[in-house]
């Protein structure tokens, strides 16, 4: 009994090739060339799609045109973004600003009597942000900072104190914060800057509000780099 394959073979051989009508075939490149062209066309389409998708996502995320996007990114530095995701340094900075205000409240600017120096809320915020920014690139962050506090009035600069967030840690960099007294208060505070021979009068003379302007000098204690001075 013939098998199914034998039947198929006999039926196909019985039909003469010459009896079948020939259909004209148009000239076309070989299959390999056609496949290569198809792959290249598909790759070009996918590349175009990916590029347009990225451009669409970028423009929808920023909300600006190409020129506005470039200007926006130029105005934003990497530390500004990283500060938002660093709760430890933000917490340390809040503690440092509290210590700073307490030190200023007991400051002694002259030999006669101490003065209570007050930081406006705007000054507290600006100083905190600047200290965080300067500590961003340090190996221990703000924990490795040694902060010297000075108050400037005219050509004189009076030291208030030195603060360290973590006394058990060897400082990696030093920050000198130079605060300023409002020049309009000078007639009221001239008595605070008397000579050393003047008698000391106990008690606080008055509360003085500091100016919102300040200067920060950064010095790396493990490097010979030049001093970095930030004027705000």
Swiss-Prot record:
Chief location: mitochondrion
Post-translational modification: Phosphorylated by GSK3B; this promotes proteasomal degradation. Polyubiquitinated by a DCX (DDB1-CUL4A-RBX1) E3 ubiquitin-protein ligase complex with BTRC as substrate-recognition component, leading to its proteasomal degradation.
Molecular function GO terms recorded: 14-3-3 protein binding
Annotated InterPro entries: RTP801-like, RTP801-like_C_sf
Pfam families the UniProt entry points to: RTP801_C (PF07809)
PANTHER family, sorted: DNA DAMAGE-INDUCIBLE TRANSCRIPT 4 PROTEIN, DNA-DAMAGE-INDUCIBLE TRANSCRIPT 4 PROTEIN DDIT4
The protein, known as: DNA damage-inducible transcript 4 protein
Organism of origin: Homo sapiens
Gene giving rise to this polypeptide: DDIT4
């Amino acid at each position: 009994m013939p098998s199914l394959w034998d039947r198929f073979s006999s039926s196909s051989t019985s039909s003469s090739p010459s009896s079948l009508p020939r259909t004209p075939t148009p000239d076309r490149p070989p299959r390999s060339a056609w496949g290569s062209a198809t792959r290249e066309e598909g790759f070009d389409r996918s590349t175009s799609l990916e590029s347009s998708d990225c451009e669409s996502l970028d423009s929808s995320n920023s909300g600006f045109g190409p020129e506005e996007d470039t200007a926006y990114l130029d105005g934003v530095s990497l530390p500004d973004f990283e500060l938002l995701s660093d709760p430890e340094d933000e917490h340390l900075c809040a503690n440092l600003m509290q210590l700073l205000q307490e030190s200023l409240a007991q400051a002694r600017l002259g030999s006669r009597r101490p003065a209570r120096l007050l930081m406006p809320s705007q000054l507290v915020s600006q100083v905190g942000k600047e200290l965080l920014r300067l500590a961003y690139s340090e190996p221990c962050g703000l924990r490795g900072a040694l902060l010297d506090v000075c108050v400037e009035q005219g050509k004189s600069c009076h030291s208030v104190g030195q603060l360290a967030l973590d006394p058990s840690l060897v400082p990696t960099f030093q920050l000198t914060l130079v605060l300023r007294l409002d020049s309009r208060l000078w007639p009221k505070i001239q008595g605070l800057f008397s000579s050393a021979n003047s008698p000391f009068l106990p008690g606080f003379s008055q509360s003085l509000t500091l100016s919102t302007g300040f200067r920060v000098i950064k010095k790396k204690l493990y490097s010979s780099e030049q001093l970095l001075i930030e004027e705000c």
